[in-house]
Amino acid sequence: MTDTPAERPDPGVAGDADWAAQARPLLVHADMRLCKRFDQGEPIERLVALRARAVDQLMRNAWMRCIPADSGLSLHAVGGYGRGELFPRSDVDVLVLGDTAAQQQHEQALARLFALLWDVGLPISHAVRSPAQCTAAAADQTVLTALIESRALVADGQARAALATAIAPPQVWPPRDFFQAKREELLARHQRFGDTADNLEPDIKDGPGGLRDLQTLGWMALRAFGVKDLEALVGLGHVGFDEAAALRREREELARLRFGLHIVANRPEERLRFDYQKTLAERLGFADDPESLGVEKMMQRFYRSAALIRRISDRLLQRFEEQFDGEATPEPLGGGFSLRRGYLAADAESWPDGDVLQVFALFAQWAAHREVRGLHSLTARALAEVLRDLPAYDIADATARERFMALLRGPRAVETLNRMARLGVLGQWIPAFASVSGRMQFDLFHVYTVDQHTLMVLRNIALFAAGRADERFSIAHEVWPRLRKPELLLLAGLFHDIAKGRGGDHSELGAVDARAFCLAHRLSEGDTELVTWLVEQHLRMSVTAQKQDISDPEVIHRFATLVGTRERLDYLYLLTCADIAGTSPKLWNAWKDRLLADLYFAARRALREGLEHPPPREERLREARESARTLMQAQGHDDVTIDRQFAGMPDENFLRFRPEQLAWQAASLIEVEIGQTLVKARRAVPDNDALEVFVYSPDRDGLFAAIVATLDRKGYGIHRARVLDAPHDAIFDVFEVLPQETYADGDPQRLAATLRQVLAGDLHKVRPARRAVPRQLRHFRFAPRVEFSESAGGRRTRISLVAPDRPGLLADVAHVLRMQHLRVHDARIATFGERAEDQFQITDEHDRPLSESARQALRDALCACLDPV
């Protein structure tokens, strides 16, 4: 930008617009040249320095245009700009330094300067302060952080010295206090992101393991040791050469991501949002292949970089702390280990002296002492250096395998596995685990990387083992004590997704890996078969519960036959609960808990009674009626009343609901006469948001659609709907719902009152609400798929609908069914991230299955309603 027009003599304020008009395209062209060099692979360190240099020249020329040479003011770059780094859309932070008299005298000139820079297109963030004001402002460590990296743009030696003196440690923030403040800031920032970088849309600047972590280490080093980069600490013995090299390499990786993100977003975006991930991956050269999408490769690279940065920065933070506090007297633990200021440390400086078995001894000591704060930085570094010598399990000797299994059988096995994963040991011991470390799946269903999901599953298993009830898992704490060998469940959890990303069925491929691992670690044939079977079938219970009708005895019989034994059922149930709950914080809810518990109890009963002769339908009806009768009698109802209510309920009702649900429905019917409408709602689980809505009404056109639309408008998501024909031309509708929007208050009485009011009016006036599709869902659109099959022995038609999920989807589907004059008998709603997979059993208005022409008309109507194109 040597040809900037600002170098001409100042023609006065009137010429500022012309100057800005000429300078603006020069800045744009400079950025375009940098973008081209970025695409050619030039190091980011050089690109951000070149951009800062270009802006430097423009800033100086604008300053000379607006500010008199004898003003007594000086101009300084601060923050990232002060470091000499400017990303494409970053703010340009500057400080104008001068005494208060000079500030006041040139106030209009400064306003002109900043306006001119904005007109050019620079996002200026400025402060005007005297040295004393800098000292006062630096009481806020975030201000000090910006100032300690200041760089003079237009300033003489006196101005530079005045600023340095104003923020020197004798004035503000002694090094130790600054270190503590920045460490607390770092920890608080990590907490804002859930203490993990493994989010679907991570923040590459401020998130854990991001660029801000590296900058924080640099600020600490600058304040404490007076060095401008971490590499300078190598000579001082505070940072290892390998650590400095690794941090420099990962900084380049993250900086390239950030530079590219600013380009594709055309704004100062720091989050890798779905809006930009694919475009950025393509720009960075990550191509799709049969096993992985390019965007998945890019994200895996990021997650691995963030994990390594966190690992090394943890060590450096501890070393910086030791510089201020000194080393405490070691507290011997035995076995060659001690506690140093609460950290576990190897006694020998040369640990582990070539003995890789010491790695397992280290984790055994860690597990044995709950008071340990973490791993001592020197021992952590020694561990990192010895990792390359740790053999994978398949080539390790029997003693090493025994040591690993001893850790797995220990009382704190899940904590140990988490630590081993975080420090890279687990991936070294099981190379397949290293392959999925940092691996994301480009969808909204899996909100964690594969390795983090696996660790979440293991943590959930640890909750089952805690021996106390958890309201999220109603029966898991009862099933857990039945496990013969809990470590087998941990192994199944460890291997269940380990084959993700290889192509093919990950359950089958993972089962092969699990078998090989079990055999290598000398598990018995029975234990090996159990772990292998669990990995291969780990999705079966979830799919059965969510996609099939578990009130159907044939479904239960098929599932129980597949499971075969009570032991397998116990293990599979716990693995399924842990897996679903570890997939997404929002995925597990009271309805899924109840659904899996119902399937568990139904399968357990089938196994107990024998699979050869399942109980006939009449016997099941009789048992359900008697169980419900017993509950109603306990509530004070006589047999005459009970029989009268049972007579008004469809037989199928007794096969689909639990006895306590039947008793609630029957007791509710006492309040209503034939031909009247009843709406009841209750909490399905005490102290939980899950609601059960029961509607008894004369059959009316549009009833189902009106109920669904009302529930949707009130912010409730429907998880299951049962629609049964009752005597006297009435219908039984039972909806299982959860608050889905913030405006759904979760009050069952208010919801029931709203539904009563709607059903008392004209149902044809009730229309689905129109709502915008959330930003994240817009990036996962696909054409809906509609399939038909027969159900109920050919008396009904089953629709299987797979479509992009969005607010109000079910209400729109119900409206289409109503406009096609179709009757809904059953609805099963399942959402998997961005995919809605719903099933309906329907008939035409004459209660007949759909003809081929009716099917085609319905398919066309649904696709027209749901197709995103």
From Swiss-Prot:
Q: Know the name of this protein?
A: Bifunctional uridylyltransferase/uridylyl-removing enzyme
User: Domain comment, in the record's words?
Assistant: Has four distinct domains: an N-terminal nucleotidyltransferase (NT) domain responsible for UTase activity, a central HD domain that encodes UR activity, and two C-terminal ACT domains that seem to have a role in glutamine sensing.
Q: Does the keyword Ion transport apply?
A: no
Please name the GO terms that the record assigns under molecular function: [protein-PII] uridylyltransferase activity; phosphoric diester hydrolase activity
Q: Does the record's keyword annotation contain Ligase? A: no
- Which HAMAP family does the record associate with it? PII_uridylyl_transf
State the source organism's domain of life.
Bacteria
Q: Lineage, please? A: Bacteria, Pseudomonadati, Pseudomonadota, Gammaproteobacteria, Lysobacterales
Residues of the region (Uridylyltransferase) are 1-332
What's the stated role of this polypeptide?
Answer: Modifies, by uridylylation and deuridylylation, the PII regulatory proteins (GlnB and homologs), in response to the nitrogen status of the cell that GlnD senses through the glutamine level. Under low glutamine levels, catalyzes the conversion of the PII proteins and UTP to PII-UMP and PPi, while under higher glutamine levels, GlnD hydrolyzes PII-UMP to PII and UMP (deuridylylation). Thus, controls uridylylation state and activity of the PII proteins, and plays an important role in the regulation of nitrogen assimilation and metabolism.
Q: What is its EC number?
A: 2.7.7.59, 3.1.4.-
Keyword terms of this UniProt record: Hydrolase, Magnesium, Multifunctional enzyme, Nucleotidyltransferase, Repeat, Transferase
Q: What are the required cofactors?
A: Mg(2+)
- Activity regulation information from UniProt: Uridylyltransferase (UTase) activity is inhibited by glutamine, while glutamine activates uridylyl-removing (UR) activity.
Q: Which InterPro entries did the record assign?
A: ACT-like_dom_sf (IPR045865), ACT_dom (IPR002912), HD/PDEase_dom (IPR003607), HD_domain (IPR006674), NT_sf (IPR043519), PII_UdlTrfase/GS_AdlTrfase (IPR013546), Polymerase_NTP_transf_dom (IPR002934), UTase/UR (IPR010043)
Under NCBIfam families, the record lists: PRK04374.1, UTase_glnD
Question: What Pfam families does UniProt report for this protein, alphabetically?
Answer: GlnD_UR_UTase (PF08335), HD (PF01966), NTP_transf_2 (PF01909)
Q: Which GO terms describe its biological process?
A: regulation of nitrogen utilization
What range(s) does the HD domain occupy? 450-572
Region annotation Uridylyl-removing: where it falls in the sequence = 333-691
Supply the source organism for this entry: Xanthomonas euvesicatoria pv. vesicatoria (strain 85-10) (Xanthomonas campestris pv. vesicatoria)
State the family named in the UniProt similarity comment for this chain: Belongs to the GlnD family.
**Which SUPFAM superfamilies does the protein's record reference?**
ACT-like (SSF55021), HD-domain/PDEase-like (SSF109604), Nucleotidyltransferase (SSF81301), Nucleotidyltransferase substrate binding subunit/domain (SSF81593)
**Swiss-Prot/TrEMBL catalytic activity:** [protein-PII]-L-tyrosine + UTP = [protein-PII]-uridylyl-L-tyrosine + diphosphate; [protein-PII]-uridylyl-L-tyrosine + H2O = [protein-PII]-L-tyrosine + UMP + H(+)
